[in-house]
Amino acid sequence: MKKRALVSVSDKTGVVEFVKGLLEQGIEVISTGGTKKLLEENGLQVIGISEVTGFPEIMDGRVKTLHPNIHGGLLAVRDNETHVAQMNELGMEPIDFVVVNLYPFKETIAKPDVTFADAIENIDIGGPTMIRSAAKNHKFVSVIVDPVDYDIVLAELKENGEVKEETKRKLAAKVFRHTAAYDALISNYLTEQMGEESPETLTVTFEKKQDLRYGENPHQKATFYKAPFAVTSSVAYAEQLHGKELSYNNINDADAALSIVKEFTEPAVVAVKHMNPCGVGVGTDIHEAYTRAYEADPVSIFGGIIAANREIDKATAEKLHEIFLEIIIAPSFSKEALEVLQSKKNLRLLTVNIEKATSASKKLTSVQGGLLVQEEDTLSLDESTISIPTKREPSEQEWKDLKLAWKVVKHVKSNAIVLAKDDMTIGVGAGQMNRVGSAKIAITQAGEKAQGSALASDAFFPMPDTLEEAAKAGITAIIQPGGSIRDEDSIKVADTYGIAMVFTGVRHFKH
């Protein structure tokens, strides 16, 4: 008996050549709608679906393959005598290949002007049903949903006259991944349309971007996946202009640097090591901002990741070229800057849009046996809700330094303390188990620069010991959430030393 293939695709990439290859192998081809028309226009002889079902395509194509003659031909177990007898009795013929990809639901809902009706109309019903049937019966049916697999199938047919069992299994597994991702997109779209924030089940789908050489350490395997919709202001959708492939740690660090630099509207440069900022500077232009970020910590910046929120010009590129860096990420690079930086063959250069995340963005964190989902911490300082409990208010320059430190501290691993002065960070204390420990690290790093600087704390002071350390170092202004039962103790210490202190009412823990 002649083998038969059913071909019905929304993505027409390579389908004409593939069907031609099937026909050359003596395989009959059944097709539908637009696919049939395309194949016939290219001189290929195919059988219309209605000839197999004995029933016309109806309801604007909504019902065409949902028929026993199709699904019987797909699901029949060929070495089961009862199945074979029933097929013969009912005049059914087996279908050995299914070549189907689904209505472009993802592409439809990505359109800015998409209507709900358009989205619903692009939910495929017959396609998923067919490919699931074929995949369930993959011992006898080869099912292809991805044009990248056309050449593999044709090569095996030419070499062996059939598709290998292992290949059929791989293709079947891809089908169920494909339909799972497709259904996840639909369920997530409808959930969002209904405004449900915490559904009883959560299905997420990501697309493989690349295999990584290894993970956080060489003994760990790792892969990089991207969200199905382009998040243009992200490392996942950044364009790499130059350099080696990104590593697992590179991606984490670049993501951290990008998150921080998005906080600033004025020209800003951020240097990151191990997902914590080691230097942040702002200026009237990107060269001045980089100079300050470098001077913030000229030791730690070595081997770091740089993010800028303005184009990298030649003058800045020449300064960047002087030290070893892993990555530079920016909205763009001037032609002259690229010429300078591309002389370092391993330096990775990425371009990306710099857009601040919205509160609608979700952050996913895996834990053993579960997944935590929360809104991104996108809250900015609201000067209308702050309070100043101390006798002295910050000066104009202190306010500038406090705002810079506050923007940075929420991106530092808790317990977090950041010192800022004259448009740059001068000390960062990260990840200590007590707040005063982080303060001591930041103060030590700042050295004499701590005199007259501003301090930001990601959470309140449980006791005034951090304030005592700040006063000893000559820090003159502090910004913190407030809310401790010992706030009055901290206020008294601040007043004793003439420190201006701001309460934001907002905590910025980062774990």
From Swiss-Prot:
The keyword Transferase applies. GO terms for biological process: 'de novo' IMP biosynthetic process. Residues 1-145 form the MGS-like domain. GO terms for cellular component: cytosol. It catalyses: (6R)-10-formyltetrahydrofolate + 5-amino-1-(5-phospho-beta-D-ribosyl)imidazole-4-carboxamide = 5-formamido-1-(5-phospho-D-ribosyl)imidazole-4-carboxamide + (6S)-5,6,7,8-tetrahydrofolate; IMP + H2O = 5-formamido-1-(5-phospho-D-ribosyl)imidazole-4-carboxamide. Transmembrane segments: none annotated. CDD domains: IMPCH. InterPro entries: AICAR_Tfase_dup_dom_sf, Cytidine_deaminase-like, MGS-like_dom, MGS-like_dom_sf, PurH-like. Keywords: Hydrolase, Multifunctional enzyme, Purine biosynthesis, Transferase. It holds the Pfam family MGS. One of its GO terms (molecular function) is IMP cyclohydrolase activity. The keyword Hydrolase applies. It comes from the Bacteria. Its EC number is 2.1.2.3, 3.5.4.10. Pathway: Purine metabolism; IMP biosynthesis via de novo pathway; 5-formamido-1-(5-phospho-D-ribosyl)imidazole-4-carboxamide from 5-amino-1-(5-phospho-D-ribosyl)imidazole-4-carboxamide (10-formyl THF route): step 1/1; Purine metabolism; IMP biosynthesis via de novo pathway; IMP from 5-formamido-1-(5-phospho-D-ribosyl)imidazole-4-carboxamide: step 1/1. Belongs to the PurH family. The IMP cyclohydrolase activity resides in the N-terminal region. HAMAP family: PurH. This is Bifunctional purine biosynthesis protein PurH. It comes from Bacillus cereus (strain Q1). The gene is purH.
